[in-house]
């Protein structure tokens, strides 16, 4: 297999989950991805955006992790979780995928807006990186394999 580096941008979304989903995912229960309505909506959004997670022969590629987010709700907020002045900790599903760094801003804006629409929080945590390099497969011809001598 031939590997080449590809210029991409990283999209990371922090998604609140309940304790049961957190526990199931931590135990490796893959069914929890489909059983949790929020994560299922996030994965549908990934599947609907062909630009996200495109690694050639593999589509809709993502990575995930579990963690906690901490915050204190300020006056004037309309929180989904927590109360004004109270420090709150939320079990969190951290979703990461990549897209081509050359993708135009209109397409990036479209899928980012979609994530904001379906995210349960008043202010979702969505990170977009500057271009970075990640490995991917390259056609054999790129390396002169199989080419006539």
Predicted region positions:
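Hydrophobic structural segments
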Residues: 1-149
